Amino acid sequence: MNFWLQEQAQSNGNRLAIVTNQLSLTYEELYHRAKTIAEYLTSLNQKRIGLYISNDIDSVVLIHACWLAHIEIAMINTRLTRHEMINQMNSVDIATIVHTLPLELEGFNLYHFNDLTQLDKHDVSGYKFNLESIASIMFTSGTTGPQKAVPQTFNNHLASAKGCKQSLGFEQNTVWLSVLPIYHISGLSVILRAVIEGFTVRLVKKFQTDDMLTQIKTYPITHMSLVPQTLKWLMDAGLTQPFSLEKILLGGAKLSPQLIEQALTYRLPVYNSFGMTETCSQFLTASPQMLKERFDTVGKPSENVEVKIKNPNAYGHGELLIKGENVMNGYLYPKYLKDTFDNDGYFQTGDIAEIDDEGYVIIYDRRKDLIISGGENIYPYQIETIAKDFEGIEDAVCVGISDDTWGQVPILYYVTNQDINQTELIEHFENHLARYKIPKKYYQVKSLPYTSTGKLQRKKVKSEDLNEGKNNES
């Protein structure tokens, strides 16, 4: 079969494929550029290369060129240290890295995108497209152990795109505003959905509130992918009506009830979702109607996806397991990980969840973020939600710290520009939580660490000294 991009060039050649503030390409133009670069890439004689790229047109051309040349791509997070990059690339036997951003990294063959045309050309027109071959390799955070390399096949991506279309909905007239980095699955999946369906992606290099608002107001944007914090920034800056937006896909972090209520008040078409690198993006999606019925749900599984709860406790809480064609076959590195799949072939996500009587899935926390205090499970998100409901608290995060008596106890960092009465805050928790769940220490801080795309860096909260403000113990 032909590659998706070639099929779109033949059937929808004049349709816009990629648009930025500087440039735009139709599907025919994108295909011809990618095919030309693919002919140069074959001279590298590499089965697999690393990509150090950005949200720009050259990077999208490069991705498709690699696939046309039958080259697997290992995506490099541009925020990593040199040491982290080297370890990742070595773990999956990468010798060559192609980059669209400035890069100096010892021990690898480096080629800037603009220099590829100095290589010899070889014809790629006879190459056949195999759905079962590896398309991309991404790395999980490695916070609970070794860095994990996730191989994603074209069929995994196709199944994910089909599931997204079924649960969210998109068509050839869709215009998807995408600011999430394409080296992450949330960003790359938009590029793949587009080339499979034939819609237009409006690509944004970096999240800037004013620029995003201008694009939403100016262009016929129908779809947009965000994390909850960036939606909050947009609403605070003036996104108080949907304009042409039909779907706002949220993921990557918990949705607070306050944010949902505000978004629905503005009639914003918010869809909460849940997915992983290992599942090629979302496999659970909650529509606005579902969120009205149950604000804390991530919805129901996509078509052809099965989910279940492993060893549920008395409350129905247990580890979420998933099975489907969107799920990877196993890690490339480390190759032999225990407890990746159960005996029935379900992938074990490491997330604590519940499936209610209506079939809605509720994610409580990552298993690694769970606080176990005196044998009791404490979900940080529950504490954070109640904290944000206290007047004057703008943001909050709960983490566990070691305790000689209980093993772990919860503490709270919160952001406010008001004078918070600590006694009243503790009383607020006492009215809503069992005593063992109430934070034992409180830190008022100026801000919490977020990535440029608005995702809370919980790992930094645990490792860095944020205690720049008031400290009180309960």
Swiss-Prot record:
The UniProt record lists the keyword ATP-binding: yes
GO molecular function terms attached to this record: ATP binding; medium-chain fatty acid-CoA ligase activity; o-succinylbenzoate-CoA ligase activity
Pfam families with a match to the protein in the record: AMP-binding, AMP-binding_C
Protein name: 2-succinylbenzoate--CoA ligase
The gene coding this protein: menE
Keyword vocabulary terms for this entry: ATP-binding, Ligase, Menaquinone biosynthesis, Nucleotide-binding
UniProt pathway annotation: Quinol/quinone metabolism; 1,4-dihydroxy-2-naphthoate biosynthesis; 1,4-dihydroxy-2-naphthoate from chorismate: step 5/7; Quinol/quinone metabolism; menaquinone biosynthesis
Originating species: Staphylococcus epidermidis (strain ATCC 35984 / DSM 28319 / BCRC 17069 / CCUG 31568 / BM 3577 / RP62A)
Family: Belongs to the ATP-dependent AMP-binding enzyme family. MenE subfamily.
EC number(s) given by UniProt: 6.2.1.26
Catalysed reactions listed for this entry: 2-succinylbenzoate + ATP + CoA = 2-succinylbenzoyl-CoA + AMP + diphosphate
